[in-house]
Structure formats: C-alpha cells, structure tokens
A protein has these predicted regions:
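Amphipathic, small/basic residue-rich leader segments at the start of a protein or domain
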Residues: 1-126, 150, 373, 582-600
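Alpha-helix capping/hinge segments and adjacent helical runs
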Residues: 2-5, 184, 261, 367, ...
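Internal maturation/activation junctions in enzymes
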Residues: 80, 128-132, 143-185, 195, ...
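A structural-propensity feature for long, helix-poor, extended segments
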Residues: 133-135, 144-147, 442-444, 452-496
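A short core secondary-structure module
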Residues: 189, 193-247
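A glycine-rich, basic-preceded beta-loop-alpha segment at the flavin cofactor/substrate interface
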Residues: 198-200, 236-253, 258, 265-296, ...
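C-terminal amphipathic alpha-helical interaction region
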Residues: 459, 475-600
Length: 600
C-alpha cells in the first residue's frame, strides 16, 4: 500500500507563490494581520504529520474491515475512533468556524488545503469530519440564534458530527419528489417521518451525537422543489444545558455494501416521527441546503484532486523501482538487468498526466477556496458578488472535471503497476474503487454539466462566463509579448475566444430544441475544464519562469513546473478538439433511435 507523503512544497507554491495567500488575506478585514505565511505553514506541517502518520496507515485497514452494523449500531474500523479523537485534540474541526461558537475563524482556503491532505491519506475517514463542516456552514448561514447556540459549539469542536439527508430510494438527483414528511408539533417542533438512503457517516461510534440536516415536506406544501423545507434532527435530544439527552426516533436501518469507501458508513436512516426543528423559512429548504451542497461539491472536487495525488505518488515510486525491458533508445541503467519502467514513454505519459491533473487540480481547488473567502469576508458588496459569480461558475467544473480526471489518474495508477496493480495488497485498485463514487454523489457529472451549461451559462445570458473569460483575457494580454510564454498564451487565447463562440452556437440550437443543452452539456463541461486548467497551468508556468530568471536555488522544482505545463498544453489540452466535434454532432444522433429499439 503506498504510504502518503504530503506534497507540502507544491501546496506552498500554489498558496504563496501562485495565489499570493498572504496578500489575499490582507485584503479581507477579518483576516488582516491575523493570517501570516508562517501561521499557514505551521498548520500545513501539523496536518501533514497527522495525515502521514495517523490516517494513511488506517486507509487500507478501513477498506479491508469496513464498518459493521448490528441492530442499528455502527462500529467503524480499527483505529478510526482514536484518530478522530486526536484530530479533535489538534483543533482541526474548529479551524474556519466562527469564534463565538468555539471556532478559530481562520480562512476556508487554509481549511481546504488541510482537507486535501486528509482526503489523500484516507478519504473514507475524512468524510466523517468533512460532512460536519457543511452542517456548520448551513447553521451559521441559516440557523436561528437559538439553534446556533444549541448545536454549533459541539459541532465546531468535533464532539458532535453532522450529516446531509437528502436522497430517498426514488429521489436522487430529482429532490422535488421526496416524500419525507414533517408534521407540526404543539411545541413548535416537527415530527419527521420517512426514510433517507445513501447517508454518508449517518451512524457511527466516533462522536457522542449526530446532527442530521434533513429535507422534508410540510403538510400542504407546494409540489416540487418549491415545497421542500429543511430541518435539524439530532440523533439524541439536547438538554437545556447543552448535554446529550434521550434518544430521538432516528435509527440506522442498515448500511450499504459498496464498491469503495468501505471505511465510511453509508446508511439507510429511518425517521419515525423524530423531533426536528425548522431551519430558515418554510418551503425554502433547498435554498438553505445549497449552502451545504456547494460546500460538499467543493469537497468532492478535493476528492478528485486527492485521487490524482495519491495514485501519482504510488505509481511514481513503483515506476522508479520496477525493472522491465530496455529503453528503445538504448539502456539507461546498463548495470541492471533491465531499465526502470519510468524510462518508457508510455509510462511517462501516464505519470505526467497524473501529475498535471493533481497539480492543476490543486491550483483550481485552492483558487475556489479563495473566492469562497471573498464571498464570506469581502469588504464590499461588489467584491462579494463578483466572487460569488466566479465561484458559482467554477464549482460544477471543479466538482465534475476533477473527479473525472481523478478517476482517470487512479486507473493510470493501476496501469503503471501492471498486473500488480490488480492485487489488493498494493493499494492501487482501492483508489480506483474509492474514487468512483466522486463522479456520482453530490450531483453526477451529467447533473453538474447541466448546472454549468443550463443554469450558470445560458440562463445568465453568459454573464458568469464572461466574468471568467475576461480574467483569462486579462492574463493573455499581460503576457502576449513575453516570448517565453508564447507557447502557452497563444493557444489559451484562441480557446478562450472559442469558448464564447461555442456557447453561442449551443444557445442558438437550444432555442429551437432545449434538449440540445442536454446533448452538449457533458462535452461542454470537459471543454471548460480543460481550458480552466490550461489557464492555471499557464499562470504556474509564468511564476516558475520568473523564479528561474531571478536565479532561484530551487531550479529542479521550477523546471518541473514549466515542463509539466508544456506537457499539459501539448498532450492533454488537445483533447478539447474531440469535445468540440462531439458538440457539433448535435442532438439527432442521440434521439433518433426509438426507446423500444434499445434492445438486447
């Protein structure tokens, strides 16, 4: 099993050199003078030590043992509970929460870097505290003062954990047809009845209470998504003094037997007139839940990045050690019986693809986290609105594109190992299994694609897209006369223009038949993802070239950055052409076959 090593050098490069984190924090009033480079690095180093030495050794244990269910009680794998207690002691759950509830009020963009390390070392374990973060955010934004005071201190400290209860057996992506009911009680609370499925971390032994955030319908509520409300439903009631009281009528009916993430309990949760409390206005639950869902979607993008990073680390180590055949251009290790497989172009192609997706994905996720900082803490309404537009556009791209490329990277990891990659003990096939869910939960790739093209681009008449393409255009204009950047800037400029043209073409076709949006959406998302990473790789190449010109002593690191950027532009970015061609194929090839003729 590959042992995870936190890529601190690259994380610091993205935070401090590419995204200028210290300057970013200085522009946000809540963080001015409070968040230095030294403080950020201290947290990163502490998290790296925890993830490398506590979580990584438990990754394969969790996969092998899984969770066990016995009469509604779920037991997590060996070591999970103890690792979680240490996580609490180190203060990581409270990192970005508000101080008045026991939080440290540090930036989300620092928290996302720590989440990357947790996810890369042990994704299944990381889902337990990760979902709590979404619950905290939802209550901070939409809860009443009483609800915040009751639930946030223990959620923030990590003593309690949270869940997101949306899905029902008949209602996954289409939440408008959920059936869980909420009947008003005389005391102002609600009796919640129904069954939710696929609830990650829905029951476990790692915390003394679990706070479920639940979507349900009130009596007489409008049909569809306009009739959904949001509720707090604790596993145990909370006494007036904040202590845990009697058990609520919430029970885990079973846990799923899954392809991957065995260490995380994926639960069927039954609510039998469980007492719940309304969050926000009646029938506005989906609006409130989007706070949780958007947090979860960025978190899932981190899973894609984590898959690329962890599979790259395992494959790289193996490729340097495994001997097979001689290089086609002559022996590279003549003293050995064969050359290391890293000398072979096909192996290098897979390794560089993993590296390009991991490092490009890191830049994208950290950029999103900075925009999230501005949305919450920006000084002016104009700044917050602009950041929210960019964040809204890039979130479906990051969630879908990074999880799909993470899955690709994981498969490359198995392929580099050859037959050994198929053997469980090496741990590479676990990454494939654990990562596959990332393309499904928190909105499938296809749902994210519809969100991007339909809601974020076409419904805004391209306003959000123009905000982002203007950023790319500004970068292109600033560097068009830089000879060293020509190989990056020229193709980026052309594709940036094509992005707008392609959008207009799809929009015109969609005016004739709205199904054209569905036909084009996934390829459009891939097109957008490849360009977005190209923009970030061009920025990284520029920073690296500037450091090399200054005479840095870290020559190898910066040369590798430029070389990987060149690989991305020459070997990965050309994939956009196939997506453009597929979009041009239109709707008819998909819809001309009658449903009854799909036969076997």
């Amino acid at each position: 099993m590959p042992q995870y090593k936190a890529p601190l050098r690259d994380m610091q490069f993205v935070l401090h050199e590419l995204l200028n984190a210290e300057e970013h924090y200085a522009k946000l009033p809540d963080f001015q003078g409070n968040v230095s480079r030294e403080l950020v690095d201290q947290y990163l180093e502490a998290a790296a030590d925890f993830c490398e030495n506590e979580l990584s050794p438990l990754n394969q244990v969790g996969d092998r043992e899984g969770c066990t269910w016995n009469d509604g009680v779920v037991t997590t794998p060996t070591g999970f509970k103890e690792a979680y207690q240490k996580y609490i002691e180190l203060g990581f759950p409270s990192l970005s929460a508000e101080e008045q509830y026991g939080g440290q009020a540090l930036p989300n963009s620092l928290g996302i870097a720590i989440s990357e390390m947790v996810g890369s070392s042990n994704w299944a374990w990381g889902m337990y505290p990760g979902l709590s973060h979404g619950a905290v955010r939802t209550l901070e934004h939409h809860g009443s003062d009483e609800q915040k005071n009751t639930y946030l201190p223990n959620l923030v400290s990590g003593v309690w954990t949270g869940t997101m209860c949306l899905t029902e057996s008949h209602a996954g992506s289409d939440l408008g047809i959920i059936r869980t009911k909420a009947e008003p009680n005389a005391d102002g609370s609600y009796a919640i009845s129904g069954e939710k499925i696929f609830i990650s971390a829905g029951e476990h032994d790692m915390a003394e209470n679990i706070i479920h955030i639940v979507l349900a319908r009130l009596p007489g509520a409008p049909k569809g998504t306009k009739g959904i409300s949001l509720f707090i439903v604790p596993k145990f009631h909370v006494n007036a003094d904040g202590t845990v009281g009697e058990r609520n009528a919430v029970r885990c009916g079973s846990i799923e037997h899954k392809m991957g993430i065995h260490g995380n309990a994926t639960c069927v949760i039954n609510f039998d007139q469980a007492k719940g409390y309304l969050i926000g206005p009646e029938n506005r639950g989906l609006n409130c839940m989007f706070t949780f869902m958007n947090t979860a979607r960025i978190g899932t993008a981190v899973q894609g990045l984590a898959a690329s990073e962890s599979s790259f680390q395992g494959a790289l180590t193996y490729a340097k050690e495994r001997l097979a055949m001689r290089s086609l251009s002559g022996p590279k290790a003549p003293e050995k019986e064969a050359d290391p497989i890293i000398v072979h172009p096909a192996v290098r192609n897979m390794l560089l693809t993993q590296k390009a997706f991991a490092e490009g994905g890191r830049a994208l996720v950290y950029l999103l986290a900075q925009y999230a900082d501005i949305v919450e803490k920006g000084e002016t309404e104009e700044e917050r609105k602009f950041a929210d537009n960019i964040l809204s556009l890039l979130t479906p791209i990051a969630k879908a594109f990074l999880t799909e490329t993470g899955s690709e990277s994981a498969k490359h990891g198995v392929q580099v190992f050859g037959g050994h990659g198929f053997i469980s003990e090496h741990g590479m096939e676990q990454i494939v299994r654990d990562t596959r869910i990332a393309c499904l939960y928190e909105g499938t790739t296809e749902i994210q694609a519809l969100d991007l093209l339909g809601r974020k681009v076409l419904q805004t008449q391209g306003a959000m897209l123009r905000d982002f393409t203007k950023i790319i255009h500004k970068f292109v204009e600033a560097n068009k006369d830089n000879a060293a950047m020509k190989e990056f800037v020229e193709p980026l400029a052309a594709l940036n223009k094509e992005w707008g043209d392609l959008t207009m073409q799809i929009g015109m076709r969609a005016m004739q038949n709205p199904d054209e949006v569905g036909a084009a959406a996934v390829d459009y998302l891939y097109f957008a993802g490849y360009i977005t990473l190209a923009y970030l790789w061009a920025r990284m190449a520029l920073v690296a070239q500037e450091k090399l010109a200054e005479g840095t002593t870290d020559v190898d690191f910066y040369n590798a950055k430029v070389t990987t950027a060149r690989f991305y532009f020459k070997k990965i970015l050309p994939r956009v052409r196939s997506h453009v061609d597929v979009i041009a194929g239109g709707l008819d090839p998909l819809m001309s076959l009658d449903a009854e003729h799909f036969a076997f």
